[in-house]
Amino acid sequence: MSAIESLKRCEIFLGLDNSDLKKIVDLPSCQEKTYQLEEVIFRAGQPADHLHVLVEGKVDLLAEVSTPSSRLLRPTLITIIGKGSVFGWPTLVPPHFFSLTAIAKAPVQVLVIGGSDIRNLFQLYPHIGYEVTRSLLQVIASRFRTIEQILITGKRSILFEIPKWTGR
């Protein structure tokens, strides 16, 4: 699958046409990467230098959460994302640090886009930035609702499937 086809399937790029997607694919930092089962893609607290688009496979997004009875932090599954999903979006939102840890749940193929490159593209082409930001807000809202449910119910790992908003 071409990089443009991968972006066409991604939830935050759905509002863009082929010429806009080509501008993203042509960024010097846009490249494909692969990760093996259980390989850490990034960790919470690291600088968010790249946006990731999942082309193939599944990725666990985990947060370190303490329980009411303990101050120890334990990894808590926030969601499992699949093909067409975006992760690593903090590269687009200051202060540009990852808040979750991403781990390959299977062998994965990812399209990686440099954060500074795509932010500069948004300044050059504000309509691209607007469309991506509008769609990104839906992704963030969905993940926020997931975290709310974890806090309200006290359940860990409440999502074991791809959320409905991915359309996959």
Please place each PLM-identified region on the residue numbering.
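Cytosolic regulatory regions built on CNB/CRP/Popeye-like sensor folds
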Residues: 1-168
